[in-house]
């Protein structure tokens, strides 16, 4: 029986994780659930899964949850940053699902890594921001980090066992790998007239053709910044050079990514676009468990198609690839700028096409400094956020 902590329990990855747990109750126990402010959802899942601990980042939310939980449930409600870091480091915890969205997930994810936990990594921003520090912490503690993002999970499944055991330091060329092919659907605006993009609404941007996701990642998929962040994540997870990484647009979202080998072979992982599949794979690795996902029906799929990315349509993807080449400071700045600009778009303060412009401006205007600690990273993250907020204010 594995004791699990689910960071970001009220989000879409949290819901999918709890669904997989419910399919395999004899193997997994929900030890703790962690959320930010969503008391109603947290109350619902606490009653359903009865964790030992329910942690709310927001203190008022914690108080509200404590008042609403049925008295017969023996659930400890906690709040506070120190309490969260202690929770993920606890000797009672075996596995941590790291699914808090954005930079907010970095401290708790890194704490779990430092504690040597089995970390199921859904928070791509942790690697985008901390990169080398994250990999070094993983190697020092012996933590097992397994990629939950469908693309990185697909790549992981297509690699040799030796490469799987050497995440963060694998020798792709030595394993015969010539290219990692990251696939992406192209989002809801793949075929939209470029002249119409500036008028696209948050509701339109959040209507992904294949996946069910939260609003922030849905917008990132529409701009293809999500693929850019995944490019950066792949660079660190698989110790890949820019020459070894390629992005391929695949509108059907059936092939989740591919690995091309020196001998001409291409290995691909296919499946229905449902996050329960990579989650179940990570939870059980190297075994296999029931995910609750319907088997892929090839006759319904009918055909698979592939396109080269158009950087005029997807400038955010180009920005992320360039930031990756520049290094850790640039990717930290870009991630922070993007979080702010996407939220501004969702709040109706800027246009869809302003996201890329503001991100590029922040990347050029934010002064960087060497990142030698998590405090350095968070300081640069804050600096970039302030610079981006200033740019949005001037725009309006």
Swiss-Prot record:
Gene that specifies this protein: dxr
Alphabetized UniProt keyword annotations: Isoprene biosynthesis, Manganese, Metal-binding, NADP, Oxidoreductase
Catalytic activity: 2-C-methyl-D-erythritol 4-phosphate + NADP(+) = 1-deoxy-D-xylulose 5-phosphate + NADPH + H(+)
Biological role stated in the UniProt entry: Catalyzes the NADPH-dependent rearrangement and reduction of 1-deoxy-D-xylulose-5-phosphate (DXP) to 2-C-methyl-D-erythritol 4-phosphate (MEP).
The keyword Isomerase belongs to this UniProt entry's keyword annotation: no
Pfam families for this protein: DXP_redisom_C, DXP_reductoisom, DXPR_C
UniProt GO BP: isopentenyl diphosphate biosynthetic process, methylerythritol 4-phosphate pathway involved in terpenoid biosynthetic process
Binding, 1-deoxy-D-xylulose 5-phosphate: 124, 150-151, 185, 208, 221, 226-227, 230
Protein name, UniProt field: 1-deoxy-D-xylulose 5-phosphate reductoisomerase
NCBIfam families: Dxr, PRK05447.1-1, PRK12464.1
Binding site for Mn(2+): 149, 151, 230
UniProt family annotation: Belongs to the DXR family.
MF terms (GO), sorted A to Z: 1-deoxy-D-xylulose-5-phosphate reductoisomerase activity; manganese ion binding; NADPH binding
Membrane-spanning intervals of the chain: none
Domain of life: Bacteria
Pathway annotation from the record: Isoprenoid biosynthesis; isopentenyl diphosphate biosynthesis via DXP pathway; isopentenyl diphosphate from 1-deoxy-D-xylulose 5-phosphate: step 1/6
Enzyme nomenclature, EC number: 1.1.1.267
Cofactors required: Mg(2+); Mn(2+)
InterPro entries hit by this protein: DXP_reductoisomerase (IPR003821), DXP_reductoisomerase_C (IPR013644), DXP_reductoisomerase_N (IPR013512), DXPR_C (IPR026877), DXPR_C_sf (IPR036169), NAD(P)-bd_dom_sf (IPR036291)
Keyword Protease set for record: no
Residues involved in NADPH binding: 10-13, 38, 123, 125, 214
């Amino acid at each position: 029986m594995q004791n699990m902590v689910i960071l970001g329990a009220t989000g879409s990855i949290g819901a999918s994780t709890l669904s997989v747990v419910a399919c395999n109750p004899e193997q997994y126990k929900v030890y703790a659930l962690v959320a930010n402010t969503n008391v109603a959802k947290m109350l619902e899942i606490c009653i359903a899964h009865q964790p030992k601990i329910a942690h709310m980042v927001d203190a008022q939310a914690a108080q509200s949850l404590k008042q609403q939980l049925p008295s017969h449930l023996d659930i400890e409600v906690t709040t506070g940053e120190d309490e969260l870091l202690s929770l993920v480091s606890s000797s009672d915890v075996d596995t941590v699902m790291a699914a808090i969205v954005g930079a907010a997930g970095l401290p708790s994810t890194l704490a779990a890594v430092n504690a040597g936990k089995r970390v199921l990594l859904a928070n791509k921003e942790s690697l985008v921001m901390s990169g080398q520090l994250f990999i070094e912490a993983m190697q020092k503690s012996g933590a097992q980090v397994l990629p939950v993002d469908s693309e990185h999970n697909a790549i992981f499944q297509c690699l040799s066992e030796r490469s799987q055991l050497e995440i963060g330091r694998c020798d792709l060329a030595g394993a015969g790998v010539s290219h990692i092919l990251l696939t992406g659907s192209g989002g809801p605006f793949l075929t939209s007239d470029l002249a119409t993009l500036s008028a696209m609404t948050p509701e339109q941007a959040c209507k992904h053709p294949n996946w069910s996701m939260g609003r922030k990642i849905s917008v990132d998929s529409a701009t293809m910044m999500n693929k850019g962040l995944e490019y950066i994540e792949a660079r660190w997870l698989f110790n890949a050079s820019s020459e070894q990484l390629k992005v391929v647009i695949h509108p059907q979202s059936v092939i989740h990514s591919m690995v091309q080998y020196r001998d001409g072979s291409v290995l691909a992982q296919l499946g229905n676009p449902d996050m329960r599949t990579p989650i179940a794979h990570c939870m059980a690795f190297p075994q296999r468990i029931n995910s609750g996902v319907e088997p892929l029906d090839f006759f319904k799929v009918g055909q698979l198609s592939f396109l080269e990315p158009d950087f005029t349509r997807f400038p955010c993807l180009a920005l992320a690839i360039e930031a990756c080449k520049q290094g850790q400071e640039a990717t930290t700045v870009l991630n922070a700028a993007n979080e702010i600009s996407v939220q501004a778009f969702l709040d109706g303060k800027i246009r869809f096409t302003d996201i890329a412009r503001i991100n590029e401006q922040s990347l050029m205007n934010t002064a960087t400094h060497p990142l030698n600690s998590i405090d350095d990273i968070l300081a640069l993250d804050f600096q970039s956020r302030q610079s981006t907020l200033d740019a949005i204010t001037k725009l309006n």
